Regions:
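Generic recognition of well-structured, leucine-rich alpha-helical segments
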Residues: 8, 49-52, 66, 80, ...
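Conserved beta-strand elements of beta-rich interaction domains across eukaryotes
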Residues: 8, 29, 42, 49, ...
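Helix-loop module immediately N-terminal to the HCX5R catalytic loop
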Residues: 40-54, 74-104
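Short coil/turn segments at secondary-structure boundaries
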Residues: 70-75, 89-93, 116-120, 148, ...
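Catalytic cysteine-centered active loop of the rhodanese-like fold, especially the PTP/DSP P-loop
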Residues: 90-145
Length: 211
């Protein structure tokens, strides 16, 4: 375990459990603490360009349901709540550490909702596996740079339906208010969870990193 921890401290391109380098090419995104991939890379992922290096992939669309239903990346799953992200951690998929099961998160621009839920997943994963650090159910997670908007502009043929509904679309103002109210309660719960997480990290002799 010390070897993996040492590697993670010295090599910045390793996945979350320190076992391998990232299988997808990354780009310098807005969020420096997260590994970002371009729309082109995700397009290649959809067409099987990385089938020889990964076991499976899941695209996690963190937008609100009306945005997702208005148009999303082929095969993407609409997981926009904390409860749904928690289910990812407790699900069976991703538990076999010998397989490379990757996740790609995004929202409209990948500026707020996507990054927040990606970080939530990693924090929950670390907490769930705090007794066997640095093991993770999902050690390899990415953020789609530019979000759905950027992907749609470049690869519209890989969207279903071939459409893009902005979060602030005037026809969905009522739905937006509904989900924003809910998200405030989720954020309050996340802050409490993060405080508990910091206590676990601070009390660990290894001074665990969430990433």
């Amino acid at each position: 375990m010390k070897t993996a921890v040492d590697k993670m401290q010295n090599e910045v391109d390793l996945i979350g459990d320190g076992s391998e380098v990232h299988s997808l090419p990354t780009t310098q995104g807005r969020h420096k603490d997260l590994k970002s991939v371009t729309p082109h890379t995700v397009s290649q992922l959809l067409t099987g360009e990385y089938d020889d290096v990964i076991s499976s992939y899941r695209i996690i669309d963190c937008r609100y349901p009306y945005e997702y239903e208005g148009g999303h990346i082929e095969g993407a799953e609409n997981l926009h709540t904390h409860a749904l992200i928690k289910d990812l951690v407790t699900s069976l998929q991703g538990r076999d550490s010998t397989q490379r099961n990757i996740l790609v998160f995004h929202c409209e621009f990948s500026s707020e909702r996507g990054p927040k839920l990606l970080r939530l997943l990693r924090n929950l994963d670390r907490k769930q596996n705090s007794d066997r650090y640095p093991f993770l159910f999902y050690p390899e997670v990415y953020l789609l740079d530019g979000g759905y908007k950027a992907f749609y502009e470049q690869h519209q043929s890989q969207c279903n339906p071939r459409n893009y509904v902005p979060m602030l679309h005037q026809d969905y103002s009522k739905q937006l208010r509904h989900f924003r109210v809910k998200s405030k309660s989720w954020t309050a719960g996340e802050k409490q969870s993060m405080r508990s997480r910091r206590l676990i990290i601070d009390s660990s002799p290894l001074k665990m990193s969430p990433w």
